[in-house]
Amino acid sequence: MGLLQGQLTHALACRHCSSITCLHSPGNLAILVLFMVWQIRRWWQLRGWQQLQPWCSGDKMTQGKGLQLLYHLAFFDCLWKQKSEEEEKEEKECLSLNPLKPYHLSKDTPIGNGFSTAPPHPSCRSEGRPRATETQEQVLIQSPSPSRSFPTFQTLTNLPVRSKRASGSSPQQTKLQLFSGLPSLYNESLKTIFLSSDGPSPLKLSICPSVFLNKVPFPPAYNLLLPCYHSSTYYPTPEAHILEDLEEIAPGSQLVQSPPSPPIPLVSSNLKPLLKGYKRIIPDTEVHTQWFTQNKEVPSVSENQGLYPQPELQKFRSSTFLYSSEVWRKRPGDLRLHQHNPELPFAFLLYPFNPQEVLDRFEMPWRNMKQNEHPKASETAMPTASPLPISLTECQRVNPTGDLSQVKTLCQTTVQKENLQIYELPISAPCQLTVPVTEGTGPPGTPPGYEAQWGILAYKGIPQASDPLMPASCHPSGSLSKVKNVNPKERLSAPKDVRENLGYREHPHVSKSPVSAPSPPLDTLSDYQRENPPEDGSGFKPQWECKETSGSPWASETPTLDFHVGFYEATPMCVPLGSEAQLKGTPSTENLCVYADIVSSPSLPSVSLPDFAIMGPQRILLESKALWETKEQKKHLWTSDSSCPHKTPLAPFIGPKRINTVDDVPRSEATGKNTDNTKKCSSSEPPFLNLNPSPALVQQPLRVSPIENPLKSKAWCGHIQRKNNFLASELPAQSLSQHLLEPSPEGVLSDVEPAGGFMKNKNHCVSASPVWECSPSPNSVLKFHISEPSGDQCNCTPKESVAEWTKDSWANELPGSSFFSALSQEPHSETELVCRNVLEREASQGPNPPAVNPPQPTAWPIQPGLSEAKAEAPSSQGEAVSEVSDHPVIHAWQWSRQLKLRLNKLQQSPTFKSPGSHHSFSSSPVLNLTLESWGPSSCSQQMHPLSLHPCSSSSHPPKVQRAEALPVQAPHCLHSSSQPQAQASGRAEQRSQKSKRLKRKAMVQIPSPGLGHVKADENCSGMGEPSDTGLLVSGKRQDKTLVLLSTQKRGSSRKSKAEKCGRTARLGSPTNTRENNPAQACRPAEASMPRFSRKFEHKAQSSPHSALAQQLLPNAAGPQDRPRTGLVAGETQNPCPFKCCPWIPTKQQLSSLSQEAPPTRGFQKLIDKFLGVHRPLPTKSSP
């Protein structure tokens, strides 16, 4: 067993690499194990050669007693250690009788004791290794005697069995080596073979195995499959093994009776058996070899090959083969054309597999055929559904040099009976991607032979007047009727010439014709052009003037897009036409074919092109025309004066954005510039709108494209502008917000739309900013407004929006805050946050009024409808605030009346009068002014209390005097009042006590912190602007801030009272709370407040003008002035501590006023009355 194992190990080693794991090693481990088991079993069963022979005889094999699998093993002969001379003689006789027995080259190798004395050779043979001339190789055939069973083995295994016989005195013992036809390497004995590391691979299968069936070689012509190799070169590759095997078999093999032919490549040996049955293709086997070799070596044709004739392909001598292959190539769906050509299955090898080639030669013509399917398709031999359509280069390949008549016939047969050659089809198709303009002019990435696929559009100087055959790039396959007259023999000398003749040299695009001849119905176009070859494409202009009727300038512009090859490969043919201008930033292409209109939208899948193309060109034209007109109408819908811009169809708004996001920025900027005239903006985008196939197709990716929101916002802006400052109109704030937020078809842009509309009202088309998210939160909406800079352009970039927001004054934030309530279900929550933030900012800045940074605040131009506002604030921010405040949701004058009545009663009461020289409350100029300013006429002006007070940054008030304020702080709220500063320090104690009382009353009276403030602000907005005195009074609110901070701690228990007083003092309170201690006012709301809004508020507060104007002036004086007015009114009225939110400014204001030293004792008594405190007030406060 050990010896057998060692022999098997050596036998399994590869002859070349001496590796057992090599694929060309003698055998598999599994086979080896099976063989060993079988050998052991048989060895012990037979016990000798005499017993083994009958078992191995052919008779036994035929009986099925042997193991056929074991005969496949290469080391079966290693088991035979002895053979008698009888066996050897019988073998000789068998070989002499066999007509196919191999001749013996020599018999020089002596054999002793049945074993060869040849020394072992290295595992891998070298150049200098002795050849088989020293030994004889025999392919043994089954001998007549039963002792020779290996022919039967050969029959079963199809393995050439060779025996090595050497002449000598001793009887020769033929050692059958079943090494898959491999030579024995002069190892005459199995023992030597197995002991040496040079053992041939036992499992090496011959490429051309010898097949014998019971003494009869089969097939008889098998010798044709055995090429003769005499090369002594070493082949390291796996094929080398086979080659070497063949080389060593060939010298002694008689199977090859014909004289050795010139060396044939290995590929031919592998493929020739397949070609045996295909003699009709090309009788010459060498041609077959060359053909397959070319296909093997050149799997894909180069670009030049795709465009120009192939010298290699011209080697084919059989024109019928090429013709049939071309026909098969052209019409794969019609098998009748190539059923008689058995070579067609191999025809595909002639065509390139390069993706670029496939696209240019196959995909484009296929699309063209699909799109240009002629109504008379039944007449044409070229089916439109053919996945492998014809191409010009293919026609030239048939015989590019001279046999063009045949090509012409073939083209006429396969394409149309209208003399439209096959080569015309891909070129005549609309939006042909391969444009044969001057080489080198094409965009980078295109083959040298191929011109810019969109060179027609990219290069305007390309037109050649010498060839007006091609009116438009979007002609269907039947549109080139004039080309049919071209003689293919004359014009097909070169592919470039052919294309030029087909009309690519001149295009209406290049010629800048006002309207290119888009692809009309194929039947109509072909018929028309038969009589009138289109010279300039103007023949079909009437059909497509609908595209031009829109009056958009893009129609007259010549496209200048330069597309690279990769663009159109994944998109329909005409898509680049529709989107080229978009990508380049130009409005659209001059010649926008209907196909482009339908398919150009990127939202449409590329698969849609073949689908709709199948519908038929005429139907496409009709539908496309209708669609175009429909989109033309839709395009101007949202620019119309309709009251509801959100009712505008989605397609006009979103479609253009989806089609091209690259062009959105310039277009949005243009939109921002054209804020006054939205129609201009819309008219500048007609091609994009037209390209949008349908709202349904566009609606899906609405949230995907951030550009879409700006577009929608732009639409809103345009509508609002047409409404003549919709915000400035008489609509209440709530109605406005609801109107803006009213669910639109898009729905996604609802929250952005109000922002866009509001900004548009200020000649800003914030929607132009392409950086907006699809559905920004209310905070983002606020940022949207804030980011909007003053001026016509909307240069709001994603980063700029944040930066500008921080820089912008409260006036910018006003619209956002105003929309906070509308956007959020809780109107007062957001406004409270804003107001509280404002108050805190103001408080943090100290008693001095915050200074506004003039450069930072973005001025919002006053709309014509805002003339009502009498804002004294010079800054545009105040104006913006006034604009926002124009639409009061709740009339604040109702509150003002109640307050007025109460104040009058208090003034009349004896308690109201204070001892000393204190002026009565009514006598106070500030009070009077506030009462007057709070007239109902001014109430309508203030729309958005939130936005006005916290957001708007008022301009610098001309007169701002500091007055001593009484800080009466309600719990959790800062009561900012713009009253004169207190002169005596002793008033602090009184203020603290009063603040407590006021807080108690405020808690009782204030209904709800959030709503109270909103209402108060609204009321304040409705009130007229206060006089300068009011401004002076309000300007001193910062002094109150310090007092309020101290009083805030004390007045936590007065929440109930503050609530009671809330309504009465609401008008003035929001401003007071904001101005006194913004830091303390409504911190909970502040926490929920968006961070950016807080920043904005902080800046607004930092500016004293904004804070003052917001409080005093509702509209006329600006948001700063409205808060002041509110403060004055609140002070004059019953001061009540404001509890949690500045939005209930009345209570805060009252409390703050009571805490701060009022300008008159009457005012202090009024506060005392509300607080229930009856104490002498300090001396008269300084004016």
Swiss-Prot record:
Expressed in kidney and testis. Expressed at lower levels in stomach, intestine, epididymis and ovary. Expressed at very low levels in heart and spleen. It comes from Mus musculus (Mouse). Residues 993-1002 have a biased composition (Basic residues). Residues 847-858 have a biased composition (Pro residues). Dispensable for normal development and fertility. Disruption phenotype: No visible phenotype. No effect on testis size, testis-to-body weight ratio, germ cell development or spermiogenesis. No effect on sperm morphology, count or motility. No effect on levels of germ cell apoptosis, chromosome H1t histone association or acrosome biogenesis. Residues 135-153, 671-685, 975-984, 1069-1079 have a biased composition (Polar residues). Residues 124-134, 487-509 have a biased composition (Basic and acidic residues). This is Spermatogenesis-associated protein 31G1. InterPro entries: Spata31g1-like.
